[in-house]
Regions:
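N-terminal membrane-targeting/anchoring modules of bacterial envelope and secretion proteins
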Residues: 1-209, 214-216, 410, 415-470
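Ordered hydrophobic segments in well-structured contexts
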Residues: 96-105, 118-123, 136-140, 235-237, ...
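Extended acidic, Ser/Thr- and Pro-enriched interaction/regulatory segments
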Residues: 160, 164-166, 170-273, 281-282
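C-terminal structured domains
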Residues: 239-470
Length: 470
């Protein structure tokens, strides 16, 4: 059956997997508890966020006022929510690699000139694709200078923030104080069947076929962007992909709010200088689509997202299924139904005596055919049914979740055998090592550095080929 028939479209299929694996409930719970206790650094650690800034050094070098403003924002940063909303790419829904996204901007006086303004950015960064093991995020400061503090101060690893993926105008996507704004900014405050205000027909026809663009919100979001630039009307650029862009003109027509229309691209090539509508404002919020199509229940979303999109939703704690870890499983063995289960921390055949097991293992070592129970145990070690879920968790950095699944199947004392499962765990460990070398400046393009290894293979992934990422 086509993906479109199962999940509405391939985009929803992609986001279903992302919401299931990318930000596990255990991460949300731990990060929330630490943030609520005032431990913002601990919350970042729980959410897989590396902190590459030193507030004490900042206070000495730039002044205590700037450091206090940044500290206030960090105390309310929900790093798990930031991970939830950061841009992702198809086909696996991983974080967009090599991204530098502005979370907040701080204007400070530059030197002795009271009229000169210097802007410091609080940014979130993702590693390049070849070093994305663990899907970790970094927090840093960027001020446009070639000097800086911490690992990311190096210009090679500290690129200019991407205007397309800025989040300083969308603080509700990471600031716990403003998450209620998500309902209005996503359009969730309007019923799906509500008649939209009249829009320019050319504007409605502009998005590519099959893309879920928030066209009805573009005028309001363009207004927010222009006001941040000190204007109320003007033109903004909208990027719909790598090869499709359009110019949106926001003009006042009468006493109402400014209306948006498709504008002509500047003939002098100045389109690149136009303000860029943030990517978070271009597309329909995936969580809203998932809820409205019935693909997920509010309880499976991030609690801050669920409370904003579905205000009458009562949090019931982490959703889960009955825990079958360690429960015996049935195997058809020589005309009978036998059990295999955990004994002393390893997976074993429960309905065969030890002497028979030793005899069958010796037979298998001599190239014979072992008992079906032993074949089932061997298959569980090499290529278990849960392999896809383990792989997804490892790819998204949830090593603890992946090991919990493996230990629930094979036992905590199991010795993994050669096969796909061990290969996936070893590959994940190597990717984490590569990330550590990158963080230390010991791997990456350049003389004297270890050349990046090949990226993880994709051919084994049964993902929709036409999946789209926000």
């Amino acid at each position: 059956m086509p993906t479109e028939n199962v999940h509405g479209d391939s985009r929803l299929s992609l986001w279903l997997r992302v919401r299931e694996y990318a930000v596990p409930a255990s991460m949300i719970e731990t990060a929330t508890a630490r943030r609520s206790a005032g431990d913002w650094a601990g919350a970042c650690a729980a959410a897989g966020v590396d902190v590459d800034l030193d507030l004490r050094f900042l206070a000495r070098s730039r002044g205590s006022e700037l450091a206090a403003r940044i500290r206030a924002d960090l105390r309310h940063l929900a790093p798990d929510l930031l991970r939830w909303h950061l841009p992702r790419i198809a086909p696996d829904g991983l974080l967009r690699p090599g991204l530098t996204s502005t979370l907040a901007r701080y204007d400070t006086a530059a030197g002795d000139d009271p009229h000169a303004v210097h802007t410091v950015h609080l940014v979130a960064r993702t590693a390049p694709a070849w070093a994305d093991g663990g899907q970790r995020i970094s927090l840093a400061l960027w001020d446009g200078s070639r000097s800086g503090q911490g690992r990311w101060g190096n210009p090679r690893h500290g690129p200019r923030p991407d205007r397309r993926f800025r989040l300083d105008l969308h603080r509700h996507l990471w600031d716990a104080r403003r998450t209620d704004e998500l309902r209005v900014r996503s359009g969730a405050d309007r019923p799906p069947a509500e008649v939209l205000p009249p829009l320019d027909p050319e504007l409605l026809a502009a998005p590519p076929q099959g893309h879920r663009c928030a066209v009805d919100r573009w005028a309001a979001e363009a207004g927010i962007l222009l006001r941040a630039e000190g204007r109320t009307t003007g033109s903004v650029a909208v990027r719909l992909g790598a090869r499709q862009r359009l110019v949106l003109d926001l003009a006042a027509d009468g006493p109402g709010p400014p209306a948006a229309r498709i504008g002509a691209a500047p003939a002098d090539g100045s389109a690149s200088a136009l303000p860029v509508l943030p990517d978070a404002a271009v597309w329909t919020l995936p969580d809203l689509d998932l809820i409205r199509t019935g693909a997920v229940e509010a309880g499976r979303l991030h609690p801050l997202v669920a409370s904003a999109l579905v205000p009458d939703h009562a949090p019931t704690g982490p959703a889960g299924t009955a825990d079958r870890a360690g429960q015996p499983r049935l195997v058809e063995c020589r005309g009978a139904r036998h059990r295999i289960g955990l004994v002393d921390g390893v997976l074993a055949a429960l309905d065969h005596d030890p002497a028979e097991i030793r005899r069958e293992e010796l037979l298998a070592a001599l190239t014979g055919t072992p008992l079906p129970c032993l074949r089932a145990i061997d298959a569980a070690h090499r290529r278990p049914d849960c392999l896809t879920g383990v792989r997804e968790r490892l790819d998204h950095g949830d090593v603890a979740g992946a090991l919990t699944v493996v230990e629930g199947l094979l036992g905590p004392d199991a010795l993994l055998r050669a096969g796909a499962l061990r290969d996936e765990l070893e590959a994940a460990a190597l990717r984490r090592i590569t990330y550590g070398l990158f963080r230390a400046g010991l791997a990456g393009p350049g003389p004297g550095r270890i050349h990046p290894g090949a990226h993880r293979p994709r051919e084994h992934r049964p993902h929709p080929r036409q999946a789209h990422a926000r």
